[in-house]
């Protein structure tokens, strides 16, 4: 799902509410994908409790106002149908909070493709490799060589590498913009 509109809207709200300097569009887009505290820490060079305050403001706004402003990528339903038809087990490993991810995937009908979904915890203690591992464990797959992580960011690629599964990078998401980025 392309969650750009909702994420950027919630980031702008958080910035305004906390009196932070406004950002250009290119910098706002950097908030899409990584854990929200990491994005605020990197962008504003912040640390400590303020990051949790910013994350709480963002999450409340995103959940209550901006969550469903997402759009499915072109042909994604067709791809999912083909995977299911070929008995491919599908799971979702995301840095979105699990409750948000469940709501958004259900809203857009992706829950018919998988019941295996794990996301970030409220305090962002889980790394991507932890989230991927939970998906694999829940799927019943025991041989990690049978697993492929499809993702659009360095976080996805590193998480897959750290747990020992293959990775396919895609450029239609937020992180990788071209084939060179994937390498």
Where are the language model's segments positioned?
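Acidic, Mg2+-coordinating phosphoryl-transfer loop and its flanking beta/alpha structural elements
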Residues: 148-183
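Surface-exposed amphipathic alpha-helices with a cationic face
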Residues: 77-85, 136, 157-161
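Conserved Lys-Pro-Asp/Glu-containing loop-to-beta segment of HAD-superfamily phosphomonoesterases
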Residues: 128-157
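Substrate-recognition element of Asp-dependent hydrolases with the DxDx(T/V) motif
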Residues: 4, 11, 76-105, 120
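A short, structured active-site edge motif that brings together acidic residues
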Residues: 111-126, 146
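Helix-loop "lid/cap" segments that line or gate small-molecule binding pockets
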Residues: 14-15, 35-49, 104, 135-137
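Active-site neighborhood of HAD-like aspartate-dependent phosphohydrolases
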Residues: 1-30, 85
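Metal-dependent phosphoesterase signature
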Residues: 41-78
């Amino acid at each position: 799902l392309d969650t750009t509109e909702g994420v950027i809207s919630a980031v702008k709200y958080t910035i305004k509410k906390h009196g932070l300097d406004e950002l250009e569009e290119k910098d706002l887009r950097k908030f899409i994908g990584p854990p929200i505290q990491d994005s605020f820490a990197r962008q504003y060079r912040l640390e400590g409790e303020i990051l949790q305050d910013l994350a709480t403001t963002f999450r409340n706004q995103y959940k209550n106002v901006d969550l469903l402003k997402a759009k499915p990528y072109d042909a994604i339903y067709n791809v999912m149908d083909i995977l299911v038809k070929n008995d491919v087990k599908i799971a979702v490993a995301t840095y979105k909070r699990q409750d948000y991810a469940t709501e958004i995937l259900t809203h857009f009908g992706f829950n018919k493709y998988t019941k295996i979904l794990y996301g970030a915890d409220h305090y962002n203690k889980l790394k991507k490799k932890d989230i991927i591992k939970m998906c694999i464990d829940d799927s019943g797959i025991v041989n990690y060589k049978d697993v492929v992580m499809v993702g659009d960011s360095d976080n996805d690629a590193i998480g897959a590498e750290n747990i020992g599964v293959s990775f396919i990078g895609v450029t239609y998401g937020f992180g990788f913009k071209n084939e060179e980025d994937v390498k």
